[in-house]
């Protein structure tokens, strides 16, 4: 027997994939260069030459048995160390390699995070518009997804509507800034208000409500805009593919508030 909730999930269609299929079909008719495809985040510029050169060097000079073998579960210590050092330089943090969890794509990292901070029967609150795949990541873990309606004037958080969705069964709040698909980055004021609300609400219900911050587009901001750095009880995710034309990978960083880097 196949689980009904999985049959329901597999039977539903992704709007993003549908748009991609329509774009491909239309491109075959009039030429793909004449179609503006805003569905999948595929590269639209060449890969950096340094990245290509590094890959070619590895293929030419590294033992193929070692090169094509499995990496450690959390990936190579040298890669995690490099990510930690980059974050420390940019944001004044004190991360070590033990704070970094690498996955193939942000999907795996998000799924891990939901299972880490929540149990079946709890809920996760996010904000519309949102990446549709959040739904199977969360519901697949046995949690309910609650969606806060958008504040269409500026796509910052509608805190009145948001507060009505958070209760004693809320395990986490999931944000995506800069947002896919609106492009809006939450302001420092919005994030501070969110932090204050979650701190007060966690105290009210007697358990932590974690903030999961999905940030694949952190590097894609314009006109001097800044994306504030979120801290405290936060699991942050970075995807290389979201900001540069390279194969997808993701970084999961533990919350500074957790007692051990292994948590």
Predicted feature locations:
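Glycine-rich "substrate-gating" loop/helix at the edge of Rossmann-like oxidoreductase active sites
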Residues: 6-11, 182, 245-246
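Short catalytic/ligand-binding loop motif for oxyanion handling, primarily in non-cytosolic enzymes
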Residues: 44-48, 181-184, 219-221, 248-251
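Active-site PLP attachment segment
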Residues: 219, 228-263
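Conserved catalytic core of Hanks-type protein kinase domains
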Residues: 58, 165, 260
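N-terminal small-domain helix-loop-helix segment of the aminotransferase-like
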Residues: 2-105, 112
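Structural scaffold positions in well-ordered secondary structure
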Residues: 38, 173, 214, 256-257
């Amino acid at each position: 027997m196949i689980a009904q909730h999985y049959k329901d999930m597999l039977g539903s269609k992704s709007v993003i994939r549908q748009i991609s299929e329509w774009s491909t079909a239309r491109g075959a008719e009039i030429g793909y260069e004449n179609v503006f495809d805003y569905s999948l985040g595929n590269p639209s510029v060449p890969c950096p030459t340094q990245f290509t050169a590094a890959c070619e060097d590895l293929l030419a000079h590294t033992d193929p048995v070692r090169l094509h073998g499995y990496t450690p579960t959390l990936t190579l210590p040298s890669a995690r160390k490099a990510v930690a050092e980059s974050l420390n330089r940019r944001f004044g943090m004190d991360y070590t390699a033990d704070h970094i969890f690498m996955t193939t794509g942000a999907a795996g990292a998000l799924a891990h995070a939901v299972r880490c901070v929540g149990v079946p029967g709890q809920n996760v609150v996010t904000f519309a518009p949102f990446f549709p795949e959040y739904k199977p990541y969360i519901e697949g873990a046995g949690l309910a997804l609650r969606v806060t309606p958008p504040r269409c004037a500026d796509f910052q958080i509608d805190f009145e509507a948001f507060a009505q969705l958070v209760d004693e069964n809320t395990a986490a709040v999931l944000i995506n800034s800069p947002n896919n698909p609106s492009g809006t980055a939450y302001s420092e004021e919005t994030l501070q208000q969110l932090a204050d609300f979650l701190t007060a609400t966690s105290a009210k219900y007697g358990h932590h409500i974690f903030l999961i911050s999905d940030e694949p587009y952190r590097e894609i901001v314009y006109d001097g805009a800044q994306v504030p750095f979120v801290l405290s009880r936060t699991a942050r995710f970075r995807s290389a593919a979201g900001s540069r034309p390279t194969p997808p990978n993701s970084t999961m960083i533990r919350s500074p508030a957790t007692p051990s880097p292994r948590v």
